[in-house]
C-alpha cells in the first residue's frame, strides 16, 4: 500500500516527458480519447476501472510516440525512449499487482455504494417531503427543455427536407424523354395554327372574291325637308365658330321657320341676359373695387342701347305700362309693418345708401361664374348686412289701475299683490302678462312695435296681407331677465291631511252664493273692429280648457256604454279592446280620517227598547249544491262526497249591483264555462260511427283510384215478385230497392234515419214493360181499325136469331174513309219532342255508373 503513491508520482513525472514526444495531432487525439474515457468512468462511478483505462491509453500511445521518434533520425531520442520503456514496464508490472490487491479489497464497496445511491434517488423521487427546486435549477431545467425541443425541431426539419429531396428524385425519375419524331410533329402542328397560305392565295389572284358595288348616288330632287341648318344660323348666328356648335331646340327652329318669332327675339331667347341686381352686392368688401364697373355705368349702358322691334311689341303697345318699378330686393316672407318714419330719417337713410353704393360697386362681371342659387344667397347676405332693425326695449308696461270695490274682498285675497321683503331692490319686477281680448289683435298699451314701411295704397292691392301680419306676427320685446320665476310669488299651500268627503254634486250646493265674489278682471284695451274682420273660427277667447269632471264623465260613459237606440239595441263593450277600462286613470279617493268619539252607552234605555226598533233583519242560509254534469252519462259516482257549504243569501243592494254588472256582460262570453269532457258512452258512439263504414257508400268522383274503363260489377237480377203486402210507394218503383229504404231486413234503424235526398236507389234504374209500352205509344202513331156494322138495321133481330133485347143500342153505320198514304219516315211529329222522366232517369243512371 505504501508503494502506490510513489508509482503515481513517477507516472505523472514521466507523462510530462512523454507529452514532449507527441505531435500536435496526436496530442489532440489523445486528449479527446482521455476525455471520453473520463466521462464513461464518471457515469459508472468506478474509480479503479477508470484508472486502469487511463493507464491502458498511455501504454497504447507510448509505442506510437516511440515510432514517431524513430522517424526523426536522432540517436539520443532513441536511447532515451528505450530506457523509458524499460522503466515503464517494470513499474507497470509492480503496479498491476498493487491494483489487483486494491480491487480485491474494494470489490464489494462499489456495489454497496451503487445500491445506496439508487435507494437515495428513489427516496428523493417518491418521498412526500421533497425539496423545492431553486431558481438556478429551474433555469437549468428550462434551458435543457428548450435545447431538447430545438433538437427535436431540427430533427423534424431534417426529416422533412429528406422527404422533399426523395420526392424530387422520384419526379426526376418519372420524366420521360420524348423522341425527336414526336417533337417534330408538335412543331408542325404549332406551325399550322399560323399558316398564311389562304392569304397568299388571295393576294396572288388565285382566289377571286366577289365585289360588292357601292350604293348609287341619286340626283338631288330638292331641298331636304328635315334640314334645320337655316334655323341654326338664325338662332346661333353666322359669326359663331364651328368648334363651339350647340344643339338647337327643334321647337325653336319650328317657331323661326313658321314666322312666329323674329330673328332678334330668337337670339335674345337663346342668349338671355342676367338681370341687374339691386342693392349692395359687395361680398369681397373693398378688395374688388377697381376690378368691377360701377352700377351707374351699367345702367347708362343699358339705357343708351336701342330697343329692337319684334312681333310682340304690338301686343305690348295695347297693354298699359305700369310706372311702378319692381323691387326684387324685398323678401317675400311675412314681415311687420313699420310706422311711417319722419322725412329727416328717410333722407339720412338715402344718403347712407348712396355712400354704400359708391364704396361697394356691383359685381355683375362675375355672374357667369355663379349659379342662380348663389345669387339668391348673395342677395340674402347683403340684405342681412345692410338691414338694421330698430328694437325698442320695454322695461315696464304701464297699465291703468283698475278701480274695484274692496268691501267684497277679504284681506287674504290681495296677498299675491303684496311686495316680498326678500326681493332684490335693483332688479325691476316683471309685470304679469296682459290678458288677450276675445277678438282682435293683441295690443299692449305703452309698447312700441317694430314693423317695416307701409305701402302707400294697401287697399288697392288684392294680395295685401297687412291684417294677417298684425294678427300673427306682433311681438313685444321685453327686457331680458334670466332669473325670472313666474311662480316665485305664489304661496305654497300645504295639502290638507284629511281629504274632503265625496258628495253628490247634483243634489245641490251647500255654499252661500252671496259670499262668492267674482275674480278681478285684468284691464284690457278695447279695439274697435269692423264686421268684415270678424273670424267665426277665432278661438283666442278661450283662455283655458275646462276638463270634464267625474260626474260628467260618468254620464258620458252611461250614454256611450248603455245607450239604447230606436230599436232597443244596447251598446256593449268593444270586441277589439276587451281590456278597456274608462276609469283606469282615475285615482281612488282616499278615505277621510275621521276621529270617532266613543260615547258611553246607556244600557238601561237600550234594554227598554223593543226588538222592533233595533232593525233586526232575518238572514236566510242556503247551501251550495254542485251542479250535475248533464253530458257525463257514464260518470255517475253516486251522491256527492263533498259536504255542503252554507252561505248567506245576498241582500237587495248586492242583487242590484249584480244586475248592473250583468248588463255589461258579453252575451257571447264563454270564459266561465268549464271544459266539457265527453263521457265513455259518447266516445263509444263516435268511434262506432267513424269505424263502421256503410256498405252503400260509393267512391267520390275525385277518387284517384277510380278507373272508368274497369268492367262493371255484376248486379244480381232483381226479384220483382218479392213484394210486401203493404205497398206505400209508387207502382213503378223496384221492389228490391224499396226493401232497402224501409229497412225490412231488420237492421234496427227507425224510419227517422232515412235520408230524404238519398239517390242511391237510382243507381241501376231501368224502365219496366209498362214504361216501354208508353214510350212506344208516344213515339209510334196509332193505327185506327175500321169497325164494320155487325147488325143490319133494316133486318129483323128476331129473324137473325141474335137474341138481343129491344133496348140494346145499336151502332150506326159510318161511311168508310179512303186509306191515307202514311210516310213511314215522317219526322214532323218529333218537332217539339222532349225526353220523358224515364229517359232522364236512364241518362242519370248511365252517368252515375260511369
From Swiss-Prot:
Motif (DPF 1): 224-226
Domain of life: Eukaryota
Location of this chain's protein in the cell: Cytoplasm; Synapse; Cytoplasmic vesicle, Secretory vesicle, Synaptic vesicle
GO cellular component: endocytic vesicle; synaptic vesicle
Stated name of the protein: Protein stoned-A
Biased composition (Basic and acidic residues): 28-38, 136-164, 574-588, 596-607
Subunit structure: Interacts with the second C2 domain of Syt.
Function text: Adapter protein involved in endocytic recycling of synaptic vesicles membranes. May act by mediating the retrieval of synaptotagmin protein Syt from the plasma membrane, thereby facilitating the internalization of multiple synaptic vesicles from the plasma membrane.
Species in which this protein is naturally found: Drosophila melanogaster
Chain intervals with Polar residues compositional bias: 78-91
Biased composition (Acidic residues): 451-462
Source lineage: Eukaryota, Metazoa, Ecdysozoa, Arthropoda, Hexapoda
Segments carrying motif DPF 2: 461-463
Amino acid at each position: 500500500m505504501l508503494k502506490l503513491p510513489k508509482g503515481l508520482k513517477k507516472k505523472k513525472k514521466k507523462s510530462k516527458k512523454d507529452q514532449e514526444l507527441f505531435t500536435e495531432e496526436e496530442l489532440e487525439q489523445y486528449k479527446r480519447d482521455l476525455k471520453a474515457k473520463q466521462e464513461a468512468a464518471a457515469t459508472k462511478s468506478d474509480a479503479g476501472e477508470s484508472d486502469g483505462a487511463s493507464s491502458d491509453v498511455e501504454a497504447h500511445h507510448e509505442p506510437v510516440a516511440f515510432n514517431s521518434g524513430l522517424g526523426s533520425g536522432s540517436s539520443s531520442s532513441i536511447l532515451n525512449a528505450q530506457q523509458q520503456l524499460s522503466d515503464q514496464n517494470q513499474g507497470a508490472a509492480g503496479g498491476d499487482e498493487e491494483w489487483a490487491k486494491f480491487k480485491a479489497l474494494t470489490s464489494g464497496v462499489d456495489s454497496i455504494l451503487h445500491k445506496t445511491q439508487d435507494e437515495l434517488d428513489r427516496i428523493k423521487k417518491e418521498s412526500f417531503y421533497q425539496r423545492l427546486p431553486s431558481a438556478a435549477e429551474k433555469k437549468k431545467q428550462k434551458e435543457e427543455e428548450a435545447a431538447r425541443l430545438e433538437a427535436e425541431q431540427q430533427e423534424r426539419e431534417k426529416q422533412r427536407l429528406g422527404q422533399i429531396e426523395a420526392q424530387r428524385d422520384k419526379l426526376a425519375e418519372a420524366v420521360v424523354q420524348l423522341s425527336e419524331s414526336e417533337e417534330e410533329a408538335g412543331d408542325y402542328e404549332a406551325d399550322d395554327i399560323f399558316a398564311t397560305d389562304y392569304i397568299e392565295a388571295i393576294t396572288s389572284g388565285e382566289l377571286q372574291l366577289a365585289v360588292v358595288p357601292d350604293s348609287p348616288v341619286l340626283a338631288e330632287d330638292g331641298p331636304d325637308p328635315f334640314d334645320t341648318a337655316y334655323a341654326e344660323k338664325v338662332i346661333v348666328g353666322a359669326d359663331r365658330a364651328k368648334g363651339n356648335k350647340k344643339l338647337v331646340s327643334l321647337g325653336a327652329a319650328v317657331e323661326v321657320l313658321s314666322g312666329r318669332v323674329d330673328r332678334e327675339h330668337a337670339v335674345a331667347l337663346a342668349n338671355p341676359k342676367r338681370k341687374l341686381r339691386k342693392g349692395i352686392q359687395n361680398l369681397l368688401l373693398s378688395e374688388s373695387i377697381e376690378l368691377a364697373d360701377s352700377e351707374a355705368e351699367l345702367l347708362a349702358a343699358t339705357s343708351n342701347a336701342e330697343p329692337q322691334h319684334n312681333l310682340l311689341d304690338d301686343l305690348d303697345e295695347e297693354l298699359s305700362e305700369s310706372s311702378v318699378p319692381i323691387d326684387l330686393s324685398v323678401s317675400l316672407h311675412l314681415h311687420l309693418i313699420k310706422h311711417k318714419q319722419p322725412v329727416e330719417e328717410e333722407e339720412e337713410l338715402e344718403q347712407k345708401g348712396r355712400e354704400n353704393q359708391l364704396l361697394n360697386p356691383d359685381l355683375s362681371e362675375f355672374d357667369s361664374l355663379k349659379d342662380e342659387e348663389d345669387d339668391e344667397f348673395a342677395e340674402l347676405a347683403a340684405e342681412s348686412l345692410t338691414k338694421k332693425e330698430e328694437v325698442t326695449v320695454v322695461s315696464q308696461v304701464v297699465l291703468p289701475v283698475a278701480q274695484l270695490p274692496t268691501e267684497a274682498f277679504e284681506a287674504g285675497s290681495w296677498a299675491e299683490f303684496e311686495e316680498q321683503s326678500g326681493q332684490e331692490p335693483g332688479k325691476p319686477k316683471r309685470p304679469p302678462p296682459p290678458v288677450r281680448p276675445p277678438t282682435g289683435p293683441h295690443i299692449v298699451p305703452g309698447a312700441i312695435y317694430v314693423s317695416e314701411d307701409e305701402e302707400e295704397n294697401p287697399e288697392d292691392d288684392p294680395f295685401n296681407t297687412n291684417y294677417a301680419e298684425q294678427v300673427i306676427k306682433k311681438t313685444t320685446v321685453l327686457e331680458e331677465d334670466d332669473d325670472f320665476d313666474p311662480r316665485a310669488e305664489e304661496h305654497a299651500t300645504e295639502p290638507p291631511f284629511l281629504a274632503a268627503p265625496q258628495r253628490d254634486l247634483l243634489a245641490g250646493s251647500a255654499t252661500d252664493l252671496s259670499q262668492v265674489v267674482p275674480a278681478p278682471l285684468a284691464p284690457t284695451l278695447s279695439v274697435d273692429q269692423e264686421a268684415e274682420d270678424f273670424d267665426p273660427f277665432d278661438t283666442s277667447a278661450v283662455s283655458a280648457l275646462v276638463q270634464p269632471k267625474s260626474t260628467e264623465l260618468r254620464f258620458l260613459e252611461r250614454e256611450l256604454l248603455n245607450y239604447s237606440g230606436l230599436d232597443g239595441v244596447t251598446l256593449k263593450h268593444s270586441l277589439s279592446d276587451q281590456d278597456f277600462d274608462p276609469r283606469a286613470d282615475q285615482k281612488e279617493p282616499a278615505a277621510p280620517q275621521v276621529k270617532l268619539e266613543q260615547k258611553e252607552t246607556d244600557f238601561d234605555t237600550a234594554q227598554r227598547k223593543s226588538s222592533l226598533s233595533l232593525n233586526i233583519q232575518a238572514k236566510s242560509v242556503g247551501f251550495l249544491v254542485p251542479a250535475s254534469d248533464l253530458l257525463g252519462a257514464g260518470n255517475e259516482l253516486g251522491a256527492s262526497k263533498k259536504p255542503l257549504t252554507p252561505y248567506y243569501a245576498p241582500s237587495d243592494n248586492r242583487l242590484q249591483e249584480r244586475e248592473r254588472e250583468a248588463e255589461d256582460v258579453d252575451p257571447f262570453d264563454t270564459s266561465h264555462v268549464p271544459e266539457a269532457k265527453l263521457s265513455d258512452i259518447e266516445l263509444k258512439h263516435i268511434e262506432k260511427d267513424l269505424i263502421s263504414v256503410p256498405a252503400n257508400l260509393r267512391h267520390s268522383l275525385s277518387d284517384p283510384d277510380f278507373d272508368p274503363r274497369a268492367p262493371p260489377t255484376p248486379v244480381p237480377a232483381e226479384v220483382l215478385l218479392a213484394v210486401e203486402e203493404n205497398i206505400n210507394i209508387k207502382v213503378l218503383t223496384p221492389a228490391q230497392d224499396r226493401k232497402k229504404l224501409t229497412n225490412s231486413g231488420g237492421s234496427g234503424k227507425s224510419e227517422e234515419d232515412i235520408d230524404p235526398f238519398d239517390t242511391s236507389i237510382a243507381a241501376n234504374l231501368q224502365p219496366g214493360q209498362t214504361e216501354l209500352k208508353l214510350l212506344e205509344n208516344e213515339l209510334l202513331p196509332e193505327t185506327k181499325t175500321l169497325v164494320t156494322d155487325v147488325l143490319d138495321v133494316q133486318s129483323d133481330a128476331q129473324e137473325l136469331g141474335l137474341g138481343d133485347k129491344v133496348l140494346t143500342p145499336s151502332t150506326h153505320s159510318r161511311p168508310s174513309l179512303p186509306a191515307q198514304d202514311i210516310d213511314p219516315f215522317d219526322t214532323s211529329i218529333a218537332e217539339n219532342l222532349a225526353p220523358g222522366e224515364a229517359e232522364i232517369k236512364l241518362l242519370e243512371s248511365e252517368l252515375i255508373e260511369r
